[in-house]
């Protein structure tokens, strides 16, 4: 359990320095969370930080289940 909290702390610290990096480490490059965080960071640094910290704290990647839908 302590290593999980330590990893979360490091991800939040990275998210404060460079918001998309913390989200990338948790969810990957092609996730919706990463794309939203990247867009918010480009539009404004502070909204990117707020969203990144929210995503890292509120969404648990182990319990987070994605639903994939076919496009065609």
From Swiss-Prot:
Organism domain of life = Eukaryota
Q: How does it sit in the membrane?
A: Multi-pass membrane protein
A Pfam family hit: Pmp3
* Bilayer-crossing regions: 9-29, 39-59
Task: Give the UniProt keywords, A-Z.
Answer: Membrane, Transmembrane, Transmembrane helix
Per the record, its GO cellular-component terms are: membrane
The record's listing under InterPro entries reads: PMP3
Q: Does the keyword Transmembrane helix apply?
A: yes
Q: Where in the cell is it found?
A: Membrane
Ubl conjugation: present as a keyword of the record? no
Give the protein family: Belongs to the UPF0057 (PMP3) family.
Q: What is this protein called?
A: Hydrophobic protein OSR8
């Amino acid at each position: 359990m302590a290593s999980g909290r330590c990893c979360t702390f490091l991800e939040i610290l990275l998210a404060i320095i460079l918001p998309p990096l913390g989200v990338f480490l948790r969810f990957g490059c092609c996730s919706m969370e990463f794309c939203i965080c990247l867009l918010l960071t480009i539009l404004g640094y502070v909204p990117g930080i707020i969203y990144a910290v929210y995503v890292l704290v509120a969404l648990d990647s182990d319990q987070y289940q994605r639903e994939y839908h076919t496009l065609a």
